[in-house]
Amino acid sequence: MEQRTTETLASLSVTTIRSVRQLVATLSGGQRQSVAVARAVLWNNRVVFLDEPTAALGVAQTRQVLDLVKRLGEQGLAVVLVSHNLSDVFEVADRITVLRLGRNVGVYEKSATNEQEIVQAITFGEQEAEASA
């Protein structure tokens, strides 16, 4: 198990964890997120769900997690990222789904949208956002 864990962390280019025997309690927030993602990959999951993975992280740890999310996509894994941080979303997403009051109000290709359009959808919902455009 230790060998597989070491190989998985290496395949994700996670270099900030000194030892797989290191206690999770001693890891930074970014390292903990990396371990959580590696655990999903280790069990051959093809979809990884990340709920606010950069919340409460510092700049360096946020960078580490976003880079990891990009590497997952490059390795062919689907990543579902829940975030309120639009700059994080636009950095790593291919497609953006906007939920408002628990309902899907739109799916946007990142290459065909911008932050303003997403904010309008979040604020007003799809129909209102289209009317105000």
Give the role of each language-model region.
Residues M1-A133:
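Glycine-rich phosphate-binding loops of nucleotide-dependent enzymes
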